């Protein structure tokens, strides 16, 4: 979502401090936040210029995805739902996003990664794979299920899963 008039850095600082306050942690002052944000930004290959722009205004698809991963890195959520994070990314941007996702994996964090393609799963290896059809999980398994889907399609993994195609 584009939000004209709201700077990306201002948005992130406000969001991070709201989370910290909720968790009973000390809020970051401007200098503390900028230091942490720059470290995370550099890890994700996000330019300083991009952070000076209004939130998502004029961002390419890849920039929006990188910004989403930056938000996740800064907010440190307990639960993250990543909906088609690989959509519209070239291979370099996909690797940056995957590296960001992998760097945030921990036993304290649950990530639900929604994708229709195997490509992302070459870089982010799932613990579990679930196939949904009509709002229900129709099949579950490990990373092997994703490989089977790529090879056989939804029709190859059973009648119920065929509806998900």
Model-found features: residue ranges?
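Helical segment within the ABC ATPase nucleotide-binding domain
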Residues: 94-107
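Conserved beta-strand-loop-alpha-helix hinge in the C-terminal portion
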Residues: 128, 132, 136-159
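Walker B catalytic motif
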Residues: 84-85, 92
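ABC-family P-loop ATPase nucleotide-binding domains
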Residues: 1-78
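Conserved H-loop
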Residues: 108-124
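Walker B motif beta-strand of ABC-family P-loop ATPases
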Residues: 78-84
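Conserved D-loop-proximal element of ABC-family nucleotide-binding domains
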Residues: 90-95, 140
């Amino acid at each position: 979502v584009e939000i004209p008039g709201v700077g990306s850095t201002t948005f992130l600082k406000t969001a991070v401090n709201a989370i910290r306050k909720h968790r009973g942690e000390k809020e970051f002052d401007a200098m503390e936040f900028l230091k942490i944000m720059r470290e995370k930004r550099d890890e994700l290959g996000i330019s300083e210029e991009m952070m000076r722009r209004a939130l998502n205004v004029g961002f390419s698809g890849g920039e929006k995805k990188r910004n989403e991963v930056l938000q996740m890195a800064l907010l440190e959520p307990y639960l993250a739902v990543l909906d088609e994070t690989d959509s519209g990314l070239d291979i370099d941007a996909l690797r940056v996003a995957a590296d960001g996702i992998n760097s945030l994996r921990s036993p304290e964090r649950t990530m639900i990664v929604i994708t229709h393609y195997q490509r992302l799963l070459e870089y982010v290896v799932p613990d579990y794979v679930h196939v949904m059809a009509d709002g229900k999980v129709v099949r579950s398994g490990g990373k092997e299920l994703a490989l089977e889907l790529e090879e056989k399609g939804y029709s190859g993994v059973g009648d119920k899963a065929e509806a998900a195609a």
